[in-house]
Each structure stands twice: as C-alpha cells, then as structure tokens.
Amino acid sequence: MLKFEILATDTSSHARRGTLTLNHGVVQTPIFMPVGTYGTVKGVMPRSLREMGAQIILGNTFHLWMRPGLDVMQSFGGLHGFEQWDKPILTDSGGFQVWSLGSMRKITEEGVHFASPVNGDKLFMSPEVSMQIQTTLNSDIVMQLDECTPYETNGHKTTEAEARKSMEMSRRWAVRSKNEFERLGNPNALFGIVQGGMYKNLRQESLEALVEMDFPGYAVGGVSVGEPKDEMLDIMAHTPHRLPAHKPRYLMGVGTPEDLVEGVAQGVDMFDCVMPTRNARNGTLFTRYGDLKIRNARHKTDHQPLDPSCTCHACAGTEGVSWNDGGRGGFSRAYLHHLDRCGEMLGPMLTTIHNLHYYLNLMREVREALDAGQFGAFRARFKAERARGV
C-alpha cells in the first residue's frame, strides 16, 4: 500500500511538502531515512531513533540475505519484528552491493553470479530473487533490481554506449521485478529506479520507460558513485522534477546537508545516505554553522557542546534544552574529543546520535519552511549559516 499526498509547493523551486502513507505508518516528506545495513542503524537503539524523529529507515537486502538469512527473517515475520522497529522500512534491491563486489561477480541478462563475501558460496541474484527476498523482509518500500552504472572503471569513464547498455538492462530488470512482485502478491510498494549514468538523454529515456510502467514511486539511482560534484548536481537538477508530480521521488545515496536542501529544491521527497553515521564514527560532525572535526587538538579543553543550537542527547542531555536556550545538560567537545582519542564506544554512539539528529532536524525545518511558504528564505539562510564555519 502507498498513498502520497502533496500538501504544499514552493513557487520559486520544485520543492514540495507531502505525506506518504505506507503499511507501517505515515511519513512526512521531505524526509531523510537513516541507513540500517544489517538490521540496525549502527550504535543507535530504536527508541533513540524514534525520539530524534526518524520516521522510516533502510535495510540492506543483500547483507540481510547473507546474514542472518531468510529462514531467520521468516520466523520473525519480517524485518520489523526482527529489529523491533514498528515504523516503515525501505529495502534496497541488493544491486549496488553486488555491483560493489567487482571481480567477485559476473553480470548477465539473467542476473548476477557472485561469490558470497561471507563464506565464498556461489550465489545468484536476479530480479525475481530480489523480489522474493524483499517480500520475506516485508519492507514497506521495495526497490527493483537494477544495475548501478559506474562513473568510471579502472580510470576509464563510462561511455554513453556503455551507460545505455546498462540502463537498458535495468529497464528490462524493472519489468521482471514488477512481474515477480505482482506474482508474489506483495502488499507493499515497489519503486522503479531511473538510471543512465551522467547522460541526460539516457536518464530521460529511462524515466519515460519507467513512468509507462506506472510504479507507485520512483528513485534516481547511479549518483554519488564517484562522479564530480558538479555532474551529480547536474543530474539532480535534470531528473527528479521530471518524474510524475503525484508520486514520491527518492534520490538514492545522497548526501551532504547542502545536497539534501538542493535536492528538495529540485523536487526530491526522500533521501538516504550513510554519511551522517559513517562520518560520526570518523570524527566529523555536522552543525548549523559547518562541519566540526572532533579530533582536532583545539577541542581538547573546549566546554561547548558540538552545536549550541542542537537539542540532541549529545548536545543537550535528557532535558533536550539547547545551550543557546540556557540548557547545560549535554556533553562537551572536550569530552567527546577524549572519548574519540581513547577509542571508547560511547564516543561514536553519541556522535552518531548527534549527526542523525542534525539530518532529521534539518528535514523538519525544511518541512516547516515549506508549510509556511518560506522555503526560499530558509534555503538562503541555511547556506549562509553553513558557510560561516565553526
């Protein structure tokens, strides 16, 4: 089941505000979706995710197929029961992970033959297998199996002919994914994925073919795969707003806070990215006034929280009152610097909570600006504040 309703639009851009109703709940859009690769958002309890405003999270079809396997998933009635998350879940198709195996896999028209990275077993992923796995996972949003078109391979930039061949295979796999999804009687929603590399004419062909197939929602894939930022932004400016206005649009694997706000302006409703969680574990924190490197020596004696305007548990403690509003319940930069230096596990747990809170709160502010008809002013203020630096 999927119902998408647009509540407001921005007159100066393609931005829109909506609600997405799925089998496990209603999602307010635009939305950022935390990534839970192995059935968990690394280091974060489900309760904490709910408290910080997460409405929908991702699961990784490929990795959950490898471990713990479909028998275990089936015994729990799907991924929701297994990871104790009662809100919507989106699962990717497994295509990107199989593509990432490089020399360990062989792609044919039928599907992908590859060696398991867990135990070396010979395995096969096809559009039909992907649909069967995702049906067992019972995710609210299922993604078609696609071939992720690389930007370059061993220093060789993908040509238009190579990108076309890849895009056309993804298009044929979309047909097979949809047929199998319907044969299985899956009650959830299947999204098609627009491919075509960095070639706008191929993106347009892919888009038109998928729209003809009438998917409940659409994703833009094959971006943030090693291409220069300006080329990624070029595709972002071209493709999302050309998708059907009455259906949700999902930009896969993107990106920085600036990318998210720009994506909203280009008509994107849904985002996911490992950046907030991965960067948190590597000591890079997102704040209203730019990125903060907690490993820098200057933070050794700094009494401030990561972001004085932030109300996350790391910055504001259990009271949830920011430093700017008089609260003093959070942890100092000095303490988080110390935890990182010592390799204490609490460090990345707190920084992950902060980064996810920042992303989710950013999307909340975007929604509020759209509700108020002030997205243009918000966008300008956001850019100025982020450029100021911490």
Swiss-Prot record:
Record: residues binding substrate: 92-96, 146, 195, 222
Enzyme Commission numbers on file: 2.4.2.29
Residues that bind Zn(2+): 310, 312, 315, 354
GO biological process, alphabetically ordered: queuosine biosynthetic process; tRNA wobble guanine modification; tRNA-guanine transglycosylation
Transmembrane intervals: none
Location of the region described as RNA binding in the Swiss-Prot/TrEMBL record: 253-259, 277-281
GO cellular component terms given for this protein: cytosol
The keyword Transmembrane helix belongs to this UniProt entry's keyword annotation: no
Keywords, alphabetical: Glycosyltransferase, Metal-binding, Queuosine biosynthesis, Transferase, tRNA processing, Zinc
A single MF term (Gene Ontology): metal ion binding
Catalytic residues (UniProt): 92, 272
Domain of life: Bacteria
Name of the top EC class for this enzyme: transferase
DNA damage listed as a keyword: no
SUPFAM superfamilies assigned: tRNA-guanine transglycosylase
Cofactor: Zn(2+)
Note on cofactor: Binds 1 zinc ion per subunit.
Known partners and oligomeric status: Homodimer. Within each dimer, one monomer is responsible for RNA recognition and catalysis, while the other monomer binds to the replacement base PreQ1.
Function of the molecule: Catalyzes the base-exchange of a guanine (G) residue with the queuine precursor 7-aminomethyl-7-deazaguanine (PreQ1) at position 34 (anticodon wobble position) in tRNAs with GU(N) anticodons (tRNA-Asp, -Asn, -His and -Tyr). Catalysis occurs through a double-displacement mechanism. The nucleophile active site attacks the C1' of nucleotide 34 to detach the guanine base from the RNA, forming a covalent enzyme-RNA intermediate. The proton acceptor active site deprotonates the incoming PreQ1, allowing a nucleophilic attack on the C1' of the ribose to form the product.
Family: Belongs to the queuine tRNA-ribosyltransferase family.
PANTHER family: QUEUINE TRNA-RIBOSYLTRANSFERASE
Identification of the protein by name: Queuine tRNA-ribosyltransferase
Gene label: tgt
